[in-house]
């Protein structure tokens, strides 16, 4: 079985950070990525379960996977083609 979270292009450790810091860090990190690259976000703030999917929708990034059954939460995001 393949772990979709295993080989991201970049990883962002947002453990211990609280809203709005995780999403601010995601935005800053994604800004410096190439289109189509993937970012693994590791977080433990419950607000990320709402904020990261919302950020992806708003900024036209693709949320490829999320694991929010227990902490730390994991999210895999692909930078959108037209997103900045």
Curated annotation (Swiss-Prot):
InterPro entries given in the database record: Sulphur_carrier_TusA, TusA-like, TusA-like_sf
Pathway noted in the entry: tRNA modification
Keywords: Cytoplasm, tRNA processing
Protein location: Cytoplasm
Coiled coil, from the record: none
GO cellular component, one term: cytoplasm
Protein's GO biological process: tRNA wobble position uridine thiolation
Signal sequence residues: none
Gene Ontology MF: a single term: sulfur carrier activity
Active site: residue positions: 19 (cysteine persulfide intermediate)
Disulfide bonds: none
Predominant cellular place of this UniProt entry's protein: cytoplasm
PROSITE patterns from the UniProt entry: UPF0033
Functional note: Sulfur carrier protein involved in sulfur trafficking in the cell. Part of a sulfur-relay system required for 2-thiolation during synthesis of 2-thiouridine of the modified wobble base 5-methylaminomethyl-2-thiouridine (mnm(5)s(2)U) in tRNA. Interacts with IscS and stimulates its cysteine desulfurase activity. Accepts an activated sulfur from IscS, which is then transferred to TusD, and thus determines the direction of sulfur flow from IscS to 2-thiouridine formation. Also appears to be involved in sulfur transfer for the biosynthesis of molybdopterin.
Quaternary organization: Interacts with IscS.
Similarity comment text for this entry: Belongs to the sulfur carrier protein TusA family.
Protein name (Swiss-Prot/TrEMBL): Sulfur carrier protein TusA
Source organism of the structure: Yersinia pestis
Gene name as annotated: tusA
